[in-house]
Swiss-Prot record:
Biological process, per Gene Ontology: detection of chemical stimulus involved in sensory perception of bitter taste
Keyword terms, alphabetized: G-protein coupled receptor, Glycoprotein, Membrane, Receptor, Sensory transduction, Taste, Transducer, Transmembrane, Transmembrane helix
Annotated gene: Tas2r143
Gene Ontology MF terms in the entry: bitter taste receptor activity; G protein-coupled receptor activity; taste receptor activity
Cytoplasmic topology ranges: 28-55, 101-127, 203-227, 286-293
Protein name per its UniProtKB record: Taste receptor type 2 member 143
Organism of origin: Mus musculus (Mouse)
One Pfam family in the UniProt entry: TAS2R
Protein's UniProt keywords contain Transmembrane helix: yes
PANTHER family: TASTE RECEPTOR TYPE 2, TASTE RECEPTOR TYPE 2 MEMBER 143
Amino acid sequence: MPSTPTLIFIIIFYLVSLASMLQNGFMMIVLGREWMRNRTLPAADMIVASLASSRFCLHGIAILANLLASFDFCYQANLIGILWDFTNTLIFWLTAWLAIFYCVKISSFSHPVLFWLKWRISQLVPRLLVVSLIIGGLSAVISATGNFMANQMTISQGFHGNCTFGHMSLDFYRYYYLYHSVLMWFTPFFLFLVSVIVLMFSLYQHVEKMRGHRPGPWDLHTQAHTMALKSLTFFFIFYIFFFLALVISSTKRKSMQSYYWAREAIIYTGIFLNSIILLFSNPKLRKALKMRF
């Protein structure tokens, strides 16, 4: 029987995951219907729809993997873990492309590269989505290779017991997984970081200029840009929060008790909060939500 704190984190993890699946499922349905009705979607909505679909799958995979690991279905849990790596890497790259897209479209900096991208990035989005799938597939191959090697080592050492301890008790697997995480996650995270910082700085400059020309506190344009800046700031904070929790969890020995469930609750709460901001910052999704409720 798990301790009370562990039980609380388990409940938080499952509730947050189910709520996030409902939320991302709603986003998928709204944007999917528009995609089918118009046979096309704006470039930004295309990325958002892909991101919502990936997050929906990630939460489902996490629930299934944890249930399998809890009942010591080691082989099945490891197979699901490979699919998790694919989906998680895909989410990192989709988030990076979304940040770059908004940075290019909204920022007011007059750099030749930004001008060139402003006219072409919408046409590049389908290709970027394909690139994300390819990188996700590469991540899955690397993960599958590491799992196979760890399985052989575990068998050769005659390990028996909880499958969650099996792989992560091996120094080889923990370092292998850490290097894999650095290779697959840090590049899109860095692109996201730079894009959001540039966009936030550009929005801040724009808000200050508008306040100087329109000193009225209730100016609608200033309010809209201020709200966008606040939403972006919260998205930025929650995403860093999620990323750090994920990296820390990749360097620690996993346990089905104690800290494992705390890390799971923190990581998936971060994804859930990011999805909330994404939902309310999209006019189409916000309108659809108001019509439903």
